[in-house]
């Protein structure tokens, strides 16, 4: 999730199509993130996360195209180490993605809390988290279409805030919002950096073409930060 996102001061629960938005978790520069619930015909409740494009961006064709690409990429990915996408579409004038709710914290939050206590994340935990992240990336990097052709998926924004750790110990990669894949219809403009600069590979920081190895480089920076408590 966007590291700049800040929870707004107030929120009134609202009905959004079949989703009842319980709480607004964060608002970034491009979208709002909500905790929501849905009801089955039998009356069962299911908690989910809704990512909804900000109203003023809904008329931006380039951005909507990028958002739809994110949904197409994410829906095609089914792996234990990736946040699962359930649905995407448009309700009234709002585009949205419905995804798995991971009850837990992201690595950025975990490291910040440890720093406040002047403690380091135990080495075995750091290695476990990095290993699980690499499993998820390996799956995404090797994903093919129905014809067996590589999709060429690259996350491009691997950072502590996009690594979620559930209270039960699951590790999941979030936010393929700026992922690059051959199936994408939206092309990043030349010279425009996508991702968080401090976790970028050298080629990504220079605005050059990125590869799947760029994601792995970013994971190495995350692992360094988890082991040392310091940014590289």
Q: Language model features by range: what are they?
A:
Residues 88:
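Activation-segment/catalytic-loop signature of the eukaryotic protein kinase fold
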Residues 92-106, 110:
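Conserved short submotifs of the Hanks-type protein kinase catalytic core
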Residues 129-130:
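Activation segment signature within eukaryotic-like protein kinase domains
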Residues 54-76:
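AlphaC helix of the eukaryotic protein kinase fold
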Residues 215:
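Conserved catalytic-loop aspartate of Hanks-type protein kinases
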Residues 21-29, 33:
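Protein kinase glycine-rich loop
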């Amino acid at each position: 999730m966007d590291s700049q996102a800040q929870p707004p001061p107030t929120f009134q629960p609202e009905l959004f199509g079949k989703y009842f938005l319980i709480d607004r978790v964060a608002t970034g520069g491009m979208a709002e993130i909500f905790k929501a619930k849905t009801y089955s015909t039998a009356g069962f409740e299911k908690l989910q996360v809704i990512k909804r494009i900000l109203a003023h961006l809904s008329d931006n064709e380039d951005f909507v195209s990028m958002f739809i690409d994110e949904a197409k990429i994410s829906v095609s990915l089914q792996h234990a180490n990736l946040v699962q996408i359930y649905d995407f579409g448009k309700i009234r004038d709002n585009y949205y993605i419905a995804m798995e709710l991971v009850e837990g914290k992201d690595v950025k939050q975990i490291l910040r809390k440890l720093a406040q206590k002047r403690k380091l994340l135990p080495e075995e935990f750091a290695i476990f988290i990095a290993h699980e992240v690499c499993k998820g990336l390996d799956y995404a990097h090797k994903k093919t279409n129905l014809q067996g052709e590589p999709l060429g998926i690259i996350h491009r924004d691997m950072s502590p805030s996009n690594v979620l750790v559930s209270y039960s110990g699951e590790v999941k990669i979030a936010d393929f919002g700026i992922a690059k894949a051959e199936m994408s219809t939206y092309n990043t403009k030349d010279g425009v950096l996508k991702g968080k600069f401090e976790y970028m590979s050298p080629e990504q920081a220079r605005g050059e073409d990125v590869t799947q190895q760029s994601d792995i480089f970013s994971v190495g920076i995350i692992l360094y930060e988890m082991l040392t408590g310091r940014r590289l």
